[in-house]
Amino acid sequence: MSSMNPEYDYLFKLLLIGDSGVGKSCLLLRFADDTYTESYISTIGVDFKIRTIELDGKTIKLQIWDTAGQERFRTITSSYYRGAHGIIVVYDVTDQESFNNVKQWLQEIDRYASENVNKLLVGNKCDLTTKKVVDYTTAKEFADSLGIPFLETSAKNATNVEQSFMTMAAEIKKRMGPGATAGGAEKSNVKIQSTPVKQSGGGCC
């Protein structure tokens, strides 16, 4: 299994953040396992998955942490910002409030993450065209003003999901430069079993 293969050139720790219900877990499920479920339930605390990718002839192991969006878990998840190489901020294109809260999530990054961490803005659920309230141009201009890459995704039909994680990996690799090695990121590799605990309530697309 490629995800268990220790032979890799880089290990990047990525973090998914954003309001509860925007589809963070579904994006991760689509990217890591290429599956989707309508009945995915709210993440409690933190879960993570690993996927190994090839980029520019290099093998990159992505350790992707999925955080709970609920306020009561904010203190738990804040510690996961430290050591992250890239942070993906997710909002729901059908939920204006989730987009408005992106600024608050970016403040969390400034507060807890390393100064040079890579960021990516993702507008999820773009398949729900009739319910869309956050315009692509509005989000793109916002991201451009901050110098952050932006993509609209759909975990449901797999639109741009692969591209989002590959974009993030490429940005981190570019920042680290040719001299970086897998060992440089190894200190953030937390050895725990992935045993997500879920509770019912609120699906995602």
Swiss-Prot record:
The family this protein is said to belong to: Belongs to the small GTPase superfamily. Rab family.
Post-translational modification, as annotated: Phosphorylated by CDK1 kinase during mitosis. (Microbial infection) Phosphocholinated at Ser-79 by L.pneumophila AnkX, leading to displace GDP dissociation inhibitors (GDI). Both GDP-bound and GTP-bound forms can be phosphocholinated. Dephosphocholinated by L.pneumophila Lem3, restoring accessibility to L.pneumophila GTPase effector LepB.
Motif Switch 1 positions after renumbering to this chain: 34-48
Domain notes: Switch 1, switch 2 and the interswitch regions are characteristic of Rab GTPases and mediate the interactions with Rab downstream effectors. The switch regions undergo conformational changes upon nucleotide binding which drive interaction with specific sets of effector proteins, with most effectors only binding to GTP-bound Rab.
UniProt xrefs under Gene3D superfamilies: P-loop containing nucleotide triphosphate hydrolases (3.40.50.300)
Its job: The small GTPases Rab are key regulators of intracellular membrane trafficking, from the formation of transport vesicles to their fusion with membranes. Rabs cycle between an inactive GDP-bound form and an active GTP-bound form that is able to recruit to membranes different sets of downstream effectors directly responsible for vesicle formation, movement, tethering and fusion. RAB1A regulates vesicular protein transport from the endoplasmic reticulum (ER) to the Golgi compartment and on to the cell surface, and plays a role in IL-8 and growth hormone secretion.
Gene Ontology CC terms, in alphabetical order: cytosol; early endosome; endomembrane system; endoplasmic reticulum; extracellular exosome; Golgi apparatus; Golgi membrane; melanosome
Lipid addition sites, S-geranylgeranyl cysteine: 204-205
Name listed for the protein in its UniProt record: Ras-related protein Rab-1A
Outcome (variant: residue 74 to A): Abolished arginine GlcNAcylation
EC number of this enzyme: 3.6.5.2
Species per Swiss-Prot/TrEMBL record: Homo sapiens
Gene: RAB1A
Regulation: Regulated by guanine nucleotide exchange factors (GEFs) which promote the exchange of bound GDP for free GTP. Regulated by GTPase activating proteins (GAPs) which increase the GTP hydrolysis activity. Inhibited by GDP dissociation inhibitors (GDIs).
Catalytic activities: GTP + H2O = GDP + phosphate + H(+)
